Amino acid sequence: MTEREQEKAYLHWLYRTAGVGSRGFMRRMEQAGTAREIYEMARAGILEDRLDVRYKEKAQKLQVAARTEDVTGEYERMRERGISLLTLQDAAYPRKLAAVRDAPYVLYYAGRLPEEERGAIALIGTRKCSAYGRAMAGEFGAALAEAGILIVSGMARGIDGIGQWAALQAGGYSLGVFGCGVDICYPSENMPLYERLLAEGGVCSEYPPGTAPRAALFPPRNRIISGLCDGVLVIEAKERSGTLITVDMALEQGREVYALPGRATDALSVGCNRLIRQGAALVTSPEEVLEELQAEPTRSASAAVCVQQSLFLPEGLPGELLKLLDYTPKPLELLQEAYREAYKTPVTVSGLCHGLLQLCAAGYAGQTAGAYYLTGVRHT
């Protein structure tokens, strides 16, 4: 193990033992030197005498750990699991993130980190999204990724996870930023996305492996999401959405903010509409975001959806029904009437339901409150 890797081993020990944050860590470094020197003082039982009284409890904890733990062995086991550690001094540390105030001194990651020369967008929004929000997250995630834009988000339920899945489905790159250790899939229902991020993209966190998700860890995480990106795109957000925390941090960091407009009566768009009123860039298509980033679209968003669907375009009644769907949920009565007008022949309710259920099972369509809509991205 090189001298640099040995220092990282002691850093890892320090982080997982004391739970050191960015500011606290820098104070300790200024007072006590390197992580290895802190370890040596802890092992000798003199650390609490060298640090500020505010850190006495942590110092005592470190002194106990220094006498009992295998520092280098623990670090090597972490590396064997495919988890790496970077510091602000490493050339591989993301430059965009390094430039922001209070960038995390240590960054754990698995998979691949984003390519610095490519544009990056944080695609974020509410967890309990509407059918329209799901569709837009999929459409923007796929189209931006196809144009070479990196999609960064928190792998949360709803908008975040849908946009990241769409980016991977389109053959692009996505990075998940966690409010827990990178070895923990949270929420657990997103395990398929987590596994794909590890294989085709990456995940990162300032918290050491094994750190369980807690509510207090997620707001600080948001500064990393925005810090890694050129801009933040808000798909849907309620009035008091946690998404707006990321927006505030993005503005502090000098990042661009984009928002999709929504209906005035839509509670899930109150946050977006307010952002637009306050100066966020209104966008209605991926091409508008690409124009802001000065990136060339590879195809239109609607074309991206069509190409994905044409690979496995269903035949017969399901295929005919697919052409009648869009991102606004439609009840059975409306679809039955639209089918009769489009194909000049009636369809029974049972036949209609059977065809729609086939589309839902294949991932082409979704259902909400008895109405059906186009998902835009097949989750297969």
Say what each PLM segment does.
Residues 2-5, 87-380:
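Glycine-biased, small-residue-rich flexible motifs in mid-sequence functional cores and linkers
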Residues 1-92, 362, 367-380:
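Short, small/acidic-rich helices and loops at N termini and domain boundaries
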